[in-house]
């Protein structure tokens, strides 16, 4: 298989030898950066003997949906992914929900700083907040500035390759790791 995309509200059946990446970040009042990132990721080479990369995309194709279902899908699946990728698009929007998700997931996953990819596009007004929050929780600055969806895709692919070569797919879904639970969204 190599590469697959699962879009909300599709059920996710987590498999141990697969690398999962959640595309957290802005959805309202911004370009469909998830689509750009996914299209770029499709072009990378995935070896048949390597773990598959599965992208969880919270952006639905339809505009009207059950908000509770969306929040639950994101809540459970973010915690179960190997890679938490957060993208802050530029512009005036403060992205309060994204800031909450970032803080929550940094706190839950602080023992696994390599799990995080945090990218900020030029023009995002709360860059300093993102940097300080990340540094306070993880003890290091992992925020990348001057990013775009294509560069974000490169970071995701590089992290995927690192997990395949040196890490352990499924590592964050073990029940003894900060409460993460195998199985994701129910």
Where are each of the predicted segments found?
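Conserved catalytic or regulatory cores that recognize and/or transform ribose-phosphate-containing ligands
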Residues: 1-186
């Amino acid at each position: 298989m190599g590469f697959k995309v699962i879009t909300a509200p599709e059920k996710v059946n987590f498999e141990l030898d697969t690398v999962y990446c959640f595309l957290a970040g802005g959805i309202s009042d911004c370009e469909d950066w998830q689509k750009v990132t996914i299209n770029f990721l499709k072009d990378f080479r995935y070896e048949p003997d390597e773990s598959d990369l599965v992208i969880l995309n919270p952006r639905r194709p339809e505009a009207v949906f059950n908000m509770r279902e969306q929040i639950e899908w994101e809540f459970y699946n973010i915690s179960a992914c190997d890679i938490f990728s957060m993208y802050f698009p530029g512009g005036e929007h403060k992205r309060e929900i994204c800031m909450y998700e970032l803080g929550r997931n940094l706190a839950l996953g602080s023992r696994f700083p390599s799990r995080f990819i945090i990218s900020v596009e030029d023009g995002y007004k709360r860059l300093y907040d993102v940097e300080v929050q990340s540094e306070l929780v993880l003890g290091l600055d992992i925020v990348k500035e001057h990013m775009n969806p294509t560069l974000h895709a490169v970071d995701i692919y590089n992290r995927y390759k690192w997990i395949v070569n040196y890490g352990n797919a499924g590592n964050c879904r073990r029940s003894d790791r900060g409460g993460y639970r195998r199985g994701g969204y129910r």
